[in-house]
């Protein structure tokens, strides 16, 4: 997913990990995240 950087801690609590550098989308900082499925 492309998560807004301020929301990353929420996604990390449910198993997502950051995979890339921050980027700007629509004027808002985002970071790419993935969640591996077991």
How would you name each of these model-derived features?
Residues 4-8, 24-38:
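C-terminal "cap" of GNAT-fold acetyltransferases
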Residues 1:
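Aromatic-lined ligand-binding clefts that engage carbohydrates, nucleic acids, or primary amines
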Residues 11, 16:
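Conserved active-site tyrosine of GNAT-family acetyltransferases
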Residues 18-20:
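A secondary-structure capping/hinge motif
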């Amino acid at each position: 997913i492309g998560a807004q950087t301020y929301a990353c801690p929420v996604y990390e609590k449910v198993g997502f990990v950051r995979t890339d550098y921050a980027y700007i989308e629509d004027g808002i900082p985002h970071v790419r995240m993935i969640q591996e499925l077991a």
